[in-house]
């Protein structure tokens, strides 16, 4: 029940921030504000007979030409090998991270490549409480001309369950989403 309420709240927040971001760009100045919202779905390679699936909302602020600060919430579902799902198979994490655009777009059609590092930790009560560490490369198009652009992320994630006495989950991840 709590996870569905958090997911609904995150979805409403994403829609609200999307409208703010869409209206914040001025035609005359053609400058975009350095605040963006990303919503994405992700999956990690199976580890210890568990497949993690994620729903992620990321609010990011570009504070310098190539550097960005991220505040993120992730709702994860841990699918066991037998495919059984229960309410206790999920966890909601809150955290943050930093990004560095190492390959800025020279051409509007290419987009930017950003190296990101995140740390999140579980909130609320869950059997899958964890601390998550993510490092990856994310691609996104330019938002100066388009209000909604695709994002793709590839990287490595480690989920530390040491507080619960469970085995850690680690592996490659892929995320697909939209940037507002």
Predicted features and spans:
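Transmembrane beta-strands of outer-membrane beta-barrel proteins
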Residues: 36-42, 70-74, 114-120, 151-157, ...
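Gram-negative (and chloroplast) outer-membrane scaffold detector with strong preference
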Residues: 58-148
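Outer-membrane beta-barrel "beta-signal"
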Residues: 36, 95-102, 168-180
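Solvent-exposed loop/turn segments connecting transmembrane beta-strands
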Residues: 41-53, 82-88, 121-133, 160-169
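Short glycine/proline- and aromatic-enriched beta-strand/turn motifs that initiate or cap beta-hairpins
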Residues: 22-77, 175
């Amino acid at each position: 029940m709590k996870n569905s309420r958090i997911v609904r709240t995150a979805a409403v927040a994403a829609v609200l921030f999307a409208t703010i971001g869409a209206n914040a760009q001025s035609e005359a100045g053609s400058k975009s504000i350095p605040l963006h919202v990303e919503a994405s779905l992700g999956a990690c390679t199976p580890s210890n007979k568990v497949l993690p699936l994620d729903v992620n909302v990321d609010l990011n602020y570009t504070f310098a030409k190539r550097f960005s600060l991220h505040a993120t919430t992730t709702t994860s579902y841990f699918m066991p090998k037998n495919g059984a799902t229960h309410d206790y198979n999920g966890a909601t994490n809150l955290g943050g991270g930093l990004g560095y655009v190492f390959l800025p777009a020279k051409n509007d059609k290419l987009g930017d490549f950003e190296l990101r590092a995140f740390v999140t930790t579980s909130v609320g009560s869950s059997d899958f409480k964890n601390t998550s560490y993510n490092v990856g490369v994310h691609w996104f198009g330019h938002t100066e001309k388009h209000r909604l652009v695709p994002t793709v992320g590839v990287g490595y994630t480690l989920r530390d369950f040491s507080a619960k006495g469970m085995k850690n989950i680690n592996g490659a991840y892929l995320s697909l989403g939209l940037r507002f």
